Amino acid sequence: MSRKSLVFVTGNQNKLKEVVAILGDAFPWKVESKDIDLPEFQGEPDEISEEKCKIAAIKIAGPVIVEDTCLCFNAFGGLPGPYIKWFLKKLGPEGLHRMLTGWEDKTAYALCTFAYSSGKPDDPVLLFRGKTMGQIVEPRGPRNFGWDPCFQPDGFHQTYAEMASEVKNGISHRGKALQALKDHFLSLSEPDIKKAKCDEHER
């Protein structure tokens, strides 16, 4: 029996590869990507994720997941947070590191939220979260995956960018959120999401 398709809304093929690798062969859905334009919402991470997922479900007309990622500097009260995409685009990893020049507190946390919709208007949007603590450092490693070069997770001497993919996926914010999503789907004989509870994996 062929697996049902689950659309991951992204135009980033690196993200798709990482998501597929983390979910693994046991995941009961076939994950495919589609690059669609979604509005840029403002607000708290959960609100942003839920609204993006609702719009995506309407456009896809079927099961869909969307991801929202935050990089939060403790010295800045959690900013850039959900707006990290725009900071990264303007400043790059080096600029993100320079933002904390003069601040003693270099600690930060990476937060990932995956939102799932069955595509049915009456079904709730489910949120799966993962959080990894770390610090902002001078960029090291390849520059092909966002702000990975300047985030060093607690307990490690390497940045995300310097890590082997299997190591990063095991401890990253995205890995934790996807593990929660995977556990949820594997706990269901059929993905009838209405009665299920979401998990939150935090480090």
From Swiss-Prot:
GO BP annotation list: deoxyribonucleoside triphosphate catabolic process; nucleoside triphosphate catabolic process; nucleotide metabolic process
Record-linked SUPFAM superfamilies: ITPase-like
Superkingdom to which the source organism belongs: Eukaryota
Cofactor binding annotation: Binds 1 divalent metal cation per subunit; can use either Mg(2+) or Mn(2+).
Gene3D superfamilies: 3.90.950.10
Hydrolase recorded as keyword: yes
Binding site for ITP: 10-15, 52, 68-69, 85, 145-148, 168, 173-174
Catalytic reactions of this protein: ITP + H2O = IMP + diphosphate + H(+); dITP + H2O = dIMP + diphosphate + H(+); XTP + H2O = XMP + diphosphate + H(+)
Compartments (UniProt record): Cytoplasm
Broad EC category: hydrolase
UniProt: Mg(2+) binding residues: E40
Catalytic activity, EC: 3.6.1.66
Keywords associated with the record: Cytoplasm, Hydrolase, Magnesium, Manganese, Metal-binding, Nucleotide metabolism, Nucleotide-binding
GO annotation, cellular component aspect: cytoplasm
Listed cofactors: Mg(2+); Mn(2+)
The protein's assembly and partners: Homodimer.
Family: Belongs to the HAM1 NTPase family.
Role: Pyrophosphatase that hydrolyzes non-canonical purine nucleotides such as inosine triphosphate (ITP), deoxyinosine triphosphate (dITP) or xanthosine 5'-triphosphate (XTP) to their respective monophosphate derivatives. The enzyme does not distinguish between the deoxy- and ribose forms. Probably excludes non-canonical purines from RNA and DNA precursor pools, thus preventing their incorporation into RNA and DNA and avoiding chromosomal lesions.
Name of the protein in question: Inosine triphosphate pyrophosphatase
Source organism: Nematostella vectensis
